[in-house]
């Protein structure tokens, strides 16, 4: 059986996008609901480019939960493994947009339905047809969902699936910063691919110098580190090669989901070029440069539009 599908485990939620930018939440007259959540976004980016993707999560059996399922399915994402519950509601994230497109979040998630997703709900047989498993730190707070991650990661490791981790730090969701750091550093060695941003590097590694940080990132199973720096471009490192792509200036209106689009489009390129887990250590600089260029173009298109999945381009639009 071919290993084709990207699975992502974690949250799917509603991003409430403000109608007015450059102001506080109190000054926003209205919000528009858009489907989001980092794992869902990564599936969306992969699917928009023509790949097979599926989300492993749980939503509330409520209007927002059904909206998410309907819209993800319309994007080509396999939603058949999404569970519904009446024990909690679908998560909401209210977004505040600055004039430059950067954002802050206010979450309604104590707990939300996704955090109640339990290990026994993970169908481990799915990984026989998996290309990659993607996860983030948002769903790794103490909860059944955290344990479900461990079950999925172990099954993916046994099946030969590429495991990708984007810490995607969201400090307001954690009791304290030390708990978040400890959790990320616990899960990081379980991944083959790690994506980290310049805004996260010093918090997680103690240094803002990526070259100095690499020894603390190449731990456990990690073979590829993607380092994104916004307007300053993006880097990719194996233990022996380095790639870089400069960003082209664009007028950003909303950066929501940009990092998710980057990793989703990069994973799509790995799959398109037949890169399996065993091939990661041998990737060359010219390959990395080419794939970084593509993902930068993907993100450049996305940030000029509002929302996350809604803003992602197809291959023809690039």
Name each region found by the language model.
Residues 44, 92-96, 233-236:
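Short beta-strand scaffold segments in enzyme catalytic cores
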Residues 52-135, 318:
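Conserved N-terminal subdomain of the carbohydrate kinase-like
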Residues 131, 192, 223:
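Receiver (REC) domain switch/active-site residues of two-component response regulators
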Residues 1-78, 117:
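Glycine-rich phosphate/adenosyl-contacting loop at the front of the ribokinase-like
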Residues 138-215, 232-233:
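Conserved beta-alpha-beta core of the PfkB/ribokinase-like small-molecule kinase fold
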